[in-house]
């Protein structure tokens, strides 16, 4: 950075949570010209009739007043509906398990919101994500957050070089425990507020109830691969590969898991055993691949690296073979359990997040598995 902090304007995306509150506090203490902005992306009254966005914005106002920075709210409900929620519904309709947080970061936080921040004369957009940006070389690199348990690069895999150039992650070098301590030391209003979970901006509501408002559920047969009927499912969209909870199959022996779906016949396939061979695959096809910087893949279109197929999963050694501009086959060194179409595959080289894509089809012994 060539500008001095006091001449550098940073817009902080504030959610009303402790992470973004501490991000804003740190930047203010470092001397930056900081503006706090709250994004309203969803008309969200929860099951109890409480509008959580109103509560969150009130917390943003309290924190901004405490640390002495201006604050605003912006509304991206239409963009969120068009770019994220519609995709989310379409994927569920297709029997897949989407990751709306990845799409939200790609289309809203680091696209629509970043553009808005730059239009306000901001030099950077900062968020409370657990990730790091390395600007020491010619290209900007995105690194995992220092707190391995909280690292969020999995959800940020679609960020491009142009976006990373304009982004700051102030808490990426901290452990969650330290973030809480800093908030308490500064007596921030959000210091003891619990972390939000649930879908990006939709929050912690009953998922089945929520989804059924938009997609009519179609109950059907739940059976083994040999055709033995085990009960009825509530609708294929409510189940994901490797799922154990909510199947309602009694009896003795090993627990039951979802091992496949037949969308045309509306059948949910289940089998017993956590390590059931049907849950393991050897390769995937991936689409919508994006790299965090150019020239990551060799001229032969291949790359050897590690990958995650779901959040907080250990890294798996893989070989990536590009089959198109944004498509690839990803071959695993060892079989991996419960790799699920619609989820993100994210590539790493040590601490660096190289990029990622969406899992399309899943293969074993050269055969496509009946995952949708």
Swiss-Prot record:
Catalytic activity: S-sulfanyl-L-cysteinyl-[protein] + uridine(34) in tRNA + AH2 + ATP = 2-thiouridine(34) in tRNA + L-cysteinyl-[protein] + A + AMP + diphosphate + H(+)
Pfam family, one: tRNA_Me_trans_C
CDD domains, per database record: MnmA_TRMU-like (cd01998)
Keyword match Zinc: no
Gene Ontology CC terms: cytoplasm
UniProt entry keywords in alphabetical sequence: ATP-binding, Cytoplasm, Disulfide bond, Nucleotide-binding, RNA-binding, Transferase, tRNA processing, tRNA-binding
Places the protein is found: Cytoplasm
UniProt cross-references to Gene3D superfamilies, sorted A to Z: Adenine nucleotide alpha hydrolases-like domains, HUPs, Translation factors
InterPro entries: MnmA-like, MnmA-like_C, MnmA-like_central, MnmA-like_central_sf, Rossmann-like_a/b/a_fold
Major localization class: cytoplasm
Regions crossing the membrane: none
EC numbers for this chain: 2.8.1.13
A GO biological process held by the record: tRNA wobble position uridine thiolation
Site (Interaction with tRNA): 129, 343
Superkingdom of source: Bacteria
Protein family membership: Belongs to the MnmA/TRMU family.
Chain's role: Catalyzes the 2-thiolation of uridine at the wobble position (U34) of tRNA, leading to the formation of s(2)U34.
Protein name, UniProt field: tRNA-specific 2-thiouridylase MnmA
Species: Bacillus pumilus (strain SAFR-032)
């Amino acid at each position: 950075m060539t500008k001095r902090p006091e001449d550098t304007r940073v817009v902080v995306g504030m959610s009303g949570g402790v992470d973004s509150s501490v991000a804003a506090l740190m930047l203010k203490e470092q001397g930056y010209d900081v503006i706090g902005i709250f994004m309203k992306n969803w008309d969200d009254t929860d099951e109890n009739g409480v509008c959580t966005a109103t509560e969150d914005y009130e917390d943003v106002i309290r924190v901004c007043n405490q640390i002495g920075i201006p604050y605003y709210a912006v509304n991206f409900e239409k963009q969120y509906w068009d770019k994220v929620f519609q995709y989310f519904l379409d994927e569920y309709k297709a029997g897949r398990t989407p990751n709306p947080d990845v799409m939200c970061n790609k289309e809203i936080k680091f696209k629509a919101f970043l553009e808005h921040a730059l239009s306000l004369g901001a030099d950077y957009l900062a968020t409370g994500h657990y990730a790091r940006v390395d600007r020491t070389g010619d290209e900007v690199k995105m690194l995992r957050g220092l707190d391995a348990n909280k690292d969020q690069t999995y959800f940020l895999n679609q960020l491009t070089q142009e976006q990373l150039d304009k982004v700051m992650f102030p808490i990426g070098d901290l452990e969650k425990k330290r973030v809480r301590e800093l908030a308490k030391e500064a007596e921030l209003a959000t210091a003891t507020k619990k972390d939000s979970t649930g879908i990006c901006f939709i929050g912690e509501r009953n998922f089945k109830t929520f989804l059924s408002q938009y997609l009519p559920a179609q109950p059907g047969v739940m059976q083994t691969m040999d055709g033995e009927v085990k009960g009825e499912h509530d609708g294929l969209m409510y189940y994901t590969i490797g799922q154990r909870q909510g199947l309602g199959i009694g009896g003795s022996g090993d627990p039951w898991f979802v091992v496949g779906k037949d969308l045309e016949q509306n059948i949910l396939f289940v089998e017993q055993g956590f390590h059931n061979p049907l849950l393991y695959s050897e390769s995937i096809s991936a689409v919508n691949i994006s790299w965090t910087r150019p020239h990551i893949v060799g001229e032969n279109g291949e790359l050897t690296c590690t990958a995650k197929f779901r959040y907080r999963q250990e890294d798996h050694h893989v070989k990536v073979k590009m089959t198109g501009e944004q498509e690839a086959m990803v071959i695993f060194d060892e079989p991996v359990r419960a790799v699920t179409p619609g989820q993100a595959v994210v590539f790493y080289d040590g601490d660096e997040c190289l990029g990622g894509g969406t899992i399309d089809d899943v293969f074993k012994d050269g055969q496509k598995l009946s995952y949708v």
